[in-house]
Amino acid sequence: MKTLIACCGIDCEKCDARIATDTGDEALRTATARKWTAMNGIEIKPEYLHCMGCRTDGVKTYYCTDMCQIRACAAGRGYATCGECVEVMTCPTVEPILKHQPDAIDNLLSFGSKRLLLRPWHESDAEILYYYAMDEEVGPRAGWAPHQSVDESRDVINNVFHNATTWAIVLRETDKVVGAIGYGPSCDCDLPARPDEPTVGYWVGKEYWNQGICTEALALLIDRVVNHTGIKSLVSGHYVDNPASGRVMEKCGFVATGECCTSPSLYGDSNRVIRVLRWER
């Protein structure tokens, strides 16, 4: 994982202000100031952009400390980076950066372990999503219908998965998407959640079952919740005829609430019984 990432998601090693400082390229610094002026709607002079990397302990630019609206917005909300804000994908303040720096959102929202990378979904993932999601044994176990086409999978990526709390599960060794995990909007259903308590959901393609991937991904998600949010608890559940999913939750600290429910909003038989579990700090 990259370690020198600006508050807005820019990789500092690719930032023109940083490159101009490292190389002494005044023409590049001037051009960057002109571009950033247009993006921000305020005058940014070249001398404001003598940058040593805005996430290091070294000298920060005048632009970063006194002018950057993105940095001020994040700091005002108590965030180290925009990646801690659930509104990042729809935020008008950071939108110019995300538009001109396609990898910024991945830099902000990706995390993982030695084996797994959890990153935002890309539209280019549509074919691999369809490959897994057309399987009639995958979606129905998690309460969603098998996909009927690549176009449907693309639509799901753009309209269901396109948020700051839903991730593709990627095997680092092969750089291959193998499943999904998230909490909040993409997972909401009819579980008996507390106020402001997100619902967690996850799945992996059938060929990756029984390899500990969901357990590892869920543990990573919980670690992110603990370290980067104020969320106090999470709720989830599994169909009683899919106990393996419940074991994943229990391994990660979820405890059965003693409640069972049904969820008419999920795919399939609305009378299927769901066992409810909860994780708490």
Regions found by a protein language model. Name each.
Residues 6, 147-154, 243-246:
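An alpha-helix initiation/capping motif
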Residues 109-139, 166, 170-281:
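Acyl-donor (CoA/ACP) binding surface of acyl/acetyltransferases
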